[in-house]
């Protein structure tokens, strides 16, 4: 069974979430993939909280504690992109790809990334925040004095390449921008830089880009071209069309699958 609803206030959204799961009398565990940043340190007093998020009214919200009051079951709590990365590895390995190391980016209203290495999430005291790394500005953005839209860093990857940056540059929402616009090559240059950073840092077998901005075929092709230009043959990778790809599970289903498998791991 599936239910979708908008993310509104914490009180309303978490109530709807609890109401949905409370219907299942044999519920054993749940998996949550949340937007972040979140506290995933089990020893922390604020474990299970959304912390300093850019999303209005959601900072310092106790997600796990609130749901546990209604649903007395184990909860696997991680980021939405970690869930997606886990789901991608699971789906791809089930069809015989034998993936051990994978990076999953979502490029939508924000940017985040999750990394799976040998079946485990990458992260020390917390999870990666790879959407907020700094990137080299595109010459057109420099010429136009475009600072970026991230409320914390302005010109980080998210500030320059997430969906809202398209509208900030053009005054038009991304889905209404013609594919001939220069703005797509600007976006591709930043997304390719993210892929370069992931390649050189983790040496993954696969980089997956999900989210609304990447849901257009022309964007993937632009990123492929720019990635090969920037990497310039420095390290070997699989053929770019096999290396930098879109999700294996349709309709953002990677996160749902990942959350299911992670929840199941709590009761096995």
Residue ranges and their predicted role:
Residues 44-59:
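A charged helix-plus-loop insertion that forms the helical arch/lid used to bind
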Residues 111-116:
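Short beta-strand scaffold segments in enzyme catalytic cores
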Residues 1-30, 38-46, 65-73, 90-101, ...:
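ATP-binding/phosphotransfer module of carbohydrate and carboxylate kinases, centering on a glycine-rich
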Residues 77-81, 85:
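Short loop/edge segments at beta-strand edges and connector loops
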Residues 80, 108, 259:
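Active-site glycine-centered loops adjacent to acidic/histidine catalytic or metal-binding residues
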Residues 103-105:
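Conserved beta-strand elements of the Class I
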């Amino acid at each position: 069974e599936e239910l979708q609803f908008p993310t509104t206030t914490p009180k309303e959204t978490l109530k709807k979430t609890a109401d949905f799961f409370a219907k299942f009398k044999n519920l054993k565990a749940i998996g949550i993939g949340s937007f972040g940043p979140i506290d995933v340190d089990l020893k922390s007093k604020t474990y299970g909280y959304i912390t300093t998020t850019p999303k209005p009214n959601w900072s310092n919200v106790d997600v796990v504690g609130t749901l546990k009051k209604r649903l007395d079951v184990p909860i696997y709590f991680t980021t939405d992109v970690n869930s997606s990365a886990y789901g991608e590895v699971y789906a791809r390995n089930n069809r015989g790809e034998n993936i051990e190391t994978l990076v999953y980016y979502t490029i939508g209203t924000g940017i985040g990334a999750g990394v799976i290495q040998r079946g485990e999430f990458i992260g020390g005291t917390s999870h990666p925040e790879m959407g907020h790394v700094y990137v080299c500005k595109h010459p057109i953005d420099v010429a136009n004095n475009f600072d970026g839209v991230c409320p914390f860093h302005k010109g980080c990857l998210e500030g320059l390449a997430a969906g809202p940056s398209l509208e900030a540059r053009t005054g038009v929402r991304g889905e209404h921008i013609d594919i001939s616009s220069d703005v797509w090559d600007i976006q591709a240059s930043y997304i390719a830089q993210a892929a370069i950073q992931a390649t050189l840092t983790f040496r993954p077998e696969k980089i997956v880009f999900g989210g609304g901005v990447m849901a257009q075929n022309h964007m993937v092709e632009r990123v492929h071209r720019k990635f090969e230009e920037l990497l310039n043959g420095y390290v070997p990778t699989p053929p770019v069309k096999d290396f930098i790809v879109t999700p294996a599970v349709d309709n953002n289903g990677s996160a749902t699958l990942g959350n299911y498998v992670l929840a199941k791991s709590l009761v096995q």
